[in-house]
């Protein structure tokens, strides 16, 4: 383990459109097939909700080490549909629903 402070080791920022497949691969590693977000749904999330999709990029190798993503909504209860329908994101929504927290092992 490096003695570097976490902010020295990783860059934290919003995901870029061209990183959707890398995020989908991390999702595949972190979750069983029946729970992992598909490539299509991951691309939809990145395209429609990039403002709530944060990544950690390892500065030593330039690769994504993990990510956190969600969507905003006025709903107060997490719905299964949020995981498969990025169009349910309401940028003005008062609540943020966490859809995934993925970190490579």
Show where each model-derived region lies.
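A short beta-loop-alpha structural element at the N-terminal edge
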Residues: 9-22
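Short loop/turn motifs at secondary-structure junctions and domain boundaries
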Residues: 44-49
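Active-site acidic-Proline motif in GNAT/NAT acetyltransferases
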Residues: 104-105
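Cytosolic beta-strand hydrophobic patch enriched in CBS
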Residues: 53-58
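Short acidic N-proximal helix/loop "leader" segments that mark the beginning
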Residues: 1-5
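Helix-loop element at the rim of GNAT/NAT acetyltransferase active sites that forms part
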Residues: 14, 24-38
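Short loop/turn microsegments at loop-to-beta-strand junctions
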Residues: 11, 51-52
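Conserved acyl-donor/pantetheine-binding loop and adjacent beta-alpha core of acyl/acetyltransferases
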Residues: 63, 67-101
């Amino acid at each position: 383990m490096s003695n570097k402070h976490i902010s020295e080791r990783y860059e934290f920022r919003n995901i870029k459109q061209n990183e959707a497949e890398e995020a989908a691969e991390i999702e595949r590693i972190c979750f069983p097939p029946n729970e992992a977000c598909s490539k299509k749904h991951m691309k939809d999330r990145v395209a429609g909700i990039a403002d709530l999709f944060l990544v950690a990029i390892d500065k030593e190798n330039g690769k994504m080490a993990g990510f956190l993503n969600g969507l905003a909504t006025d709903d107060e209860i997490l719905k299964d549909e949020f995981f498969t329908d990025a169009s349910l994101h309401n940028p003005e929504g008062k609540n943020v629903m966490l859809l995934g927290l993925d970190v490579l092992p």
